[in-house]
From Swiss-Prot:
SUPFAM superfamilies xrefs: Outer surface protein
Membrane topology annotation: Lipid-anchor
GO cellular-component term (any): cell surface
Lipid moiety-binding region (S-diacylglycerol cysteine): C17
Native organism: Borreliella burgdorferi
Main location: membrane
Signal peptide segment: 1-16
Gene coding for it: ospA
Protein location: Cell outer membrane; Cell surface
Lipidation residue positions, type N-palmitoyl cysteine: C17
Keywords annotated in UniProt: Cell outer membrane, Lipoprotein, Membrane, Palmitate, Plasmid, Signal
Alphabetical list of InterPro entries matching this protein: OM_lipoprot_Borrelia (IPR001809), OM_lipoprot_dom_sf (IPR023322)
Name by which UniProt lists this protein: Outer surface protein A
Lineage: Bacteria, Pseudomonadati, Spirochaetota, Spirochaetia, Spirochaetales
Sequence similarity: Belongs to the OspA lipoprotein family.
């Protein structure tokens, strides 16, 4: 009888271990906050394999996984009704989450979103072949850079949403170019794939006395505008994804006053006049 009861107890214990992932609740787990306003439940005890059980709910889909750590890091997976697969990867230090949706084959990407603790994120969408067609990068300061209609050669459309206005342009395999036009003047802001910003100014004005030119200084991220060999304005493209404008004196030798942040598209166009 004792052997029988011992056997039953062992079976029940094994079942309990196997059910760790499917039976997590507030009593036997700890809730951990993750980037992207997600939460993961982590079992208080290890399972039979010496791992901690993980559970999270994303868009009403329950994801499950295991981890060697009890801090919430690890990989969780689930399957949608259409048989597509969802995979959530939580970094070891909990600073980033990567949410992937894949086709039934488990290899072809449908979408992918990486979210950081500072609330910045990169979201990608793919076509039927698993080729990238859209990429949205939300920065920690709330500004957004979007690439849409991406073709196989890397070309497409680009849009940057700053605090109060939007810049639009084109995308190539090497960079995004955002353009603002005012009269005969065209301001182009280039953003490389690594995030480096440069700017240039072109003027189709045929009169040399009023024709504007621009010189870029990579060290200070400044575009200096010159008219008739005199410096007139300095546009600074800051690391905070803003643009400031400051005027030169009448001689074109020294900057006057203080730099003013450009807050609207009209203000940016005025700076090009």
């Amino acid at each position: 009888m004792k052997k029988y009861l011992l056997g039953i107890g062992l079976i029940l214990a094994l079942i309990a271990c196997k059910q760790n992932v499917s039976s997590l609740d507030e009593k036997n787990s700890v809730s951990v906050d993750l980037p992207g306003e997600m939460k993961v439940l982590v079992s208080k005890e290890k399972d039979k394999d010496g791992k901690y059980s993980l559970m999270a709910t994303v868009d009403k889909l329950e994801l499950k996984g295991t981890s060697d750590k009890n801090n919430g890091s690890g990989v969780l997976e689930g399957v949608k009704a259409d048989k597509s697969k969802v995979k959530l990867t939580v970094s070891d230090d909990l600073s980033t989450t990567t949410l992937e949706v894949l086709k039934e084959d488990g290899k072809t990407l449908v979408s992918k979103k990486r979210t950081s603790k500072d609330k910045s994120s990169t979201e990608e969408k793919f076509n039927e072949k698993g080729e990238l067609v859209e990429k949205i990068m939300a920065r920690a300061n709330g500004t957004i850079l979007e690439y849409t209609g991406i073709k196989s050669d890397g070309s497409g459309k680009a849009k940057e949403t700053l605090k109060e206005y939007v810049l639009e342009g084109t995308l190539t395999a090497e960079k995004a170019t955002l353009v603002v036009k005012e009269g005969t003047v065209t301001l182009s802001k280039h953003i490389s794939k690594s995030g480096e910003v440069t700017a240039e100014l072109n003027d189709t004005d045929s009169t040399q006395a009023t024709k504007k030119t621009g010189k870029w200084d990579a060290g200070t991220s400044t575009l200096t505008i010159t008219v008739n060999n005199k410096k007139t304005k300095a546009l600074v493209f800051t690391k905070q994804d803003t643009i400031t404008s400051q005027k030169y004196d009448s001689a074109g030798t020294n900057l006057e006053g203080t730099a003013v942040e450009i807050k609207t598209l009209d203000e940016l166009k005025n700076a090009l006049r």
